[in-house]
Amino acid sequence: MIFKEYATQVINLVNKSTEDIRERNHGLQGTLYLASVEGHAPRLYAQWITAFHKKNPHVQYSLWNGNSDDVVHRVMNGLCDLAIIIEPHNAEGVESLPVYQEPWVAMIPASNPLSQNPSPTIRACELLPYELFIPSRTSRLEEISKWFGPDAKPIVRGRIAHLLSAYELTRLGVGITIYPASAGDIANLTDVCIKEIVEPANTASYILIWNKYRQLSHVAEEFLNFIKER
């Protein structure tokens, strides 16, 4: 057992020395495996990668997206280095860094009477008579249901992981979508109306996560440090 541990240490040192020499000669290399939810997370990655790429042009990127539960699963099983999710999370062994906040909004079909009100906000109770689409994360249904009070039950017609699907269903008048405010980034505002949900006001809080029990690759450590310094 002692010999095996010693041999592992020697191999790790050799690999690190080889990596250091390659980095001195050619710059930082390797592949960053990233995952995220939708909403504002893809924009964060785009901003970070753009700036990081200017300093490290040889790094490659593999990006994957899904709902928060799926993303956490990938982190905990070593399928990605770093990931962005929306709180809350209850995964043990996850380190996190807050990176962004935005309000929740209702994306309403232009044909819906609610879209005729010029107010930029809407109370949660006003959505009760209508069929809703919400993010697909398991815990999100319970969270959103609480917005309507203990005696009310929203009509949740669908659970959606991808923003484009939510937008298309809303645009065609199937229902109203509840999503973080960045949903408005892709919306054609002649087809849908975006209103911030108030009473209660709620915030979508994005966090960057990684598995504290797994050693990050060198390129992932450099990327994480780069984000922390911004």
Question: Where do the protein language model's features map onto the residues?
Answer:
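Alpha-helical "hinge/linker" immediately C-terminal to small N-terminal DNA-binding modules
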Residues: 1-23, 29
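Central regulatory/effector-binding core of bacterial HTH transcription factors
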Residues: 29-92, 160
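Short, well-ordered beta-strand segments
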Residues: 31-35, 83, 107, 133, ...
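A late-sequence structural motif
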Residues: 44, 174, 193-230
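Hydrophobic hinge/microswitch elements
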Residues: 67-72, 76-80, 85-86, 137-195
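Flexible hinge/capping segments at coil-to-helix
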Residues: 94-132
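Short beta-strand->loop
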Residues: 95-105, 110, 177, 181, ...
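Secondary-structure junction motif
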Residues: 120-124, 129-152, 216-224
